[in-house]
Amino acid sequence: MSSFITKTVLAALVAAAGVRAHGHVESITVGGTEYEGLNPGAAAFENPRKELAAWFATNTDNGFVEPSAFGDADIICHRGAENAVKSAKVKAGEKITIKWDTWPESHKGPVIDYLASCGSAGCAKVDKTSLKFFKIAEAGMTSGGKFASDDLIAAGNTWEVTVPTSIKAGNYVLRHEIIALHAAGQENGAQNYPQCFNLEVESDGTAEPAGVAGTSLYTASEKGIVFDLYNNPTSYPIPGPKMNIAGGSSGAAPSTPATPTTGSGSDTPSNTAAPVESAPAESAAPVESAPAAGNGNQNNGGASPVETEAPATPQPTKTGCKAKKARRHARDMMN
């Protein structure tokens, strides 16, 4: 009985904390250039809207997409998502630093990154339901029961993902996502926070990985979506399709990155490359012992970044939880 009370109280507390603390990606930095992210609360009142490389979304509460909506378009790039009109320029093999404005410690879970080719339509006009996403990096449990989200918080709410070196040049949508597991002990308890950016990739590579429609990335009942965070887990099965491209990696960003310049993004040109759809598959990740920062339990086809130090520099000048209320009833987290 005491175990039941403990689990239900914990679930209620973290749900209440989540109402206040949900976050969004405030910027990405590529090759020393910083691109502004979408602030959904502010963007709802902008007229005209800012022209960004970040996709527009209507999650003004910084809220989430729940598993019951995995078959809906909202899971692709968040609720009510609309195409970004600009693109961030990146070279294959280059790191993208992703900066969240905040992330609650209670919302533990994996960090997963995908790409999808925009094809001949170009990313500013592509139908989001036609995008086929392939996983380029994933991180689940790290050491000592910690999750990738803990590493992200420890790195100042930042994350790094490397664009695969073998990928074909073209225009892509980057889908960066944290899945919060604090209420995932039962079906429909996980919380998905997808964030999308347009990329213009320069590359000599030729790889065109098969992909999966955003509405087919996950199922509500699969392992890793249903997961008991409070039962002292020692491993975590990362959900979603398996990776089928090498040369990508991800991990917590260095504690003192170089000072970026500010970019508005380029107009998104057309691209003729389009991946072929494949069925999703579960990806599990074993526990590793004492990894370096951001290097835990990853299946990413490449080495993860190593923490480095750099001289202190001035901060860059940038250009630029009621909603979907968190469940206030306590979930029965018992198996």
From Swiss-Prot:
It is found in: Secreted. It comes from the Eukaryota. It is an enzyme of class 1 (oxidoreductase). Its EC number is 1.14.99.56. Residues 321-335 have a biased composition (Basic residues). One of its GO terms (biological process) is cellulose catabolic process. CDD domains: LPMO_AA9. Its cofactor is Cu(2+). One of its GO terms (molecular function) is metal ion binding. Residues 241-335 are annotated as: Disordered. It catalyses: [(1->4)-beta-D-glucosyl]n+m + reduced acceptor + O2 = 4-dehydro-beta-D-glucosyl-[(1->4)-beta-D-glucosyl]n-1 + [(1->4)-beta-D-glucosyl]m + acceptor + H2O. InterPro entries: AA9, AA9_LPMO. GO terms for cellular component: extracellular region. Gene3D superfamilies: 2.70.50.70. Keywords: Carbohydrate metabolism, Cellulose degradation, Copper, Disulfide bond, Metal-binding, Monooxygenase, Oxidoreductase, Polysaccharide degradation, Secreted, Signal. O2 binds at H182, Q191. Disulfide bonds join C77-C196. Binds 1 copper ion per subunit. Residues 251-303 have a biased composition (Low complexity). Residues 1-21 form the signal peptide. Cu(2+) binds at H22, H107, Y193. Lytic polysaccharide monooxygenase (LPMO) that depolymerizes crystalline and amorphous polysaccharides via the oxidation of scissile alpha- or beta-(1-4)-glycosidic bonds, yielding C1 or C4 oxidation products. Catalysis by LPMOs requires the reduction of the active-site copper from Cu(II) to Cu(I) by a reducing agent and H(2)O(2) or O(2) as a cosubstrate. Is capable of cleaving cellulose, but not chitin. Is also active on tamarind xyloglucan and longer xyloglucan oligosaccharides. This is AA9 family lytic polysaccharide monooxygenase A. It comes from Gibberella zeae (strain ATCC MYA-4620 / CBS 123657 / FGSC 9075 / NRRL 31084 / PH-1) (Wheat head blight fungus). The lineage of its organism: Eukaryota, Fungi, Dikarya, Ascomycota, Pezizomycotina. The gene is LPMO9A.
